[in-house]
């Protein structure tokens, strides 16, 4: 849509207001974190551990992981990587590791480390990603980085956010640590994330929304449409 839609281009040019529908318990959200996936792969030669004709993929992954642990600890403790606007105020650097060894006495032919971090507005994570790539080069680990979603930010003092608060009868806007489609529509200046239901009930096995929230949300969306589209 962002790359090919002419309608979206017109929306950007005309200053269209945007409401990203997500379960916020009808709270007005003016900022959220982004998302970045890192996939690091090391390769070896699978074989029975009693033979010399094998090389464990874990051996090149281990020193790489040591550097990733150092980055993890750094972003958890150093203020320059944190933003107190959010809870938690960190990048939430998560590390998962898995190899393909079928048994304890068989060396791993491939080991994969998947990492996930949540960038925040005002913090440039590219220096960290560069360090990950450099660590991969040093240890023979292939690194692939995917930017899944950008950060989302609108000034809490903007007229649009303040009007939204009045319509929703909320005292102040909030931030959340998850991501939404709002991270894609970055060229829309006036925007909020807003909707019925709770994020704790969304994306679960038994995903649900209360009828009360659904009814309130329907009424609120209608109210916002009348206000901004019909001038009422």
Give the label of every model feature segment.
Residues 30, 37-232:
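Metal-dependent amide/peptide-bond hydrolase catalytic core
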């Amino acid at each position: 849509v962002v790359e090919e839609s002419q309608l979206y281009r017109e929306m950007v040019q005309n200053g269209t207001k945007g409401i990203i529908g997500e379960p916020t318990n009808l709270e007005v959200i003016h900022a959220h974190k982004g998302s970045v996936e890192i996939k690091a792969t090391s390769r070896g030669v699978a074989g029975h551990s009693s033979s010399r004709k094998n090389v464990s993929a874990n051996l090149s992954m281990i020193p790489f992981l040591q550097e990733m642990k150092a980055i993890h600890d750094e972003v958890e403790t150093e203020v320059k990587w944190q933003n107190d606007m959010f809870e938690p105020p960190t990048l939430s650097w998560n590390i998962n590791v898995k190899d393909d060894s079928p048994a304890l006495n068989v060396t791993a032919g491939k080991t994969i480390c998947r990492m996930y971090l949540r960038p925040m507005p005002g913090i440039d994570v590219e220096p960290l990603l560069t360090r990950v790539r450099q660590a991969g080069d040093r240890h023979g680990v292939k690194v692939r980085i995917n930017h899944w979603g950008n950060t989302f930010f609108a000034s809490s003092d903007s007229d649009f956010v303040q009007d939204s608060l009045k319509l929703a009868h909320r005292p102040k806007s909030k931030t959340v640590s998850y991501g939404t489609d709002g991270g894609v529509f970055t060229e829309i200046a006036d925007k909020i994330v807003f909707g019925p239901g709770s994020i704790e009930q969304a994306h679960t096995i038994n995903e649900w929304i209360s009828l009360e929230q659904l009814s309130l949300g329907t009424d609120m969306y209608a109210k916002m449409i009348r206000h901004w589209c019909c001038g009422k």
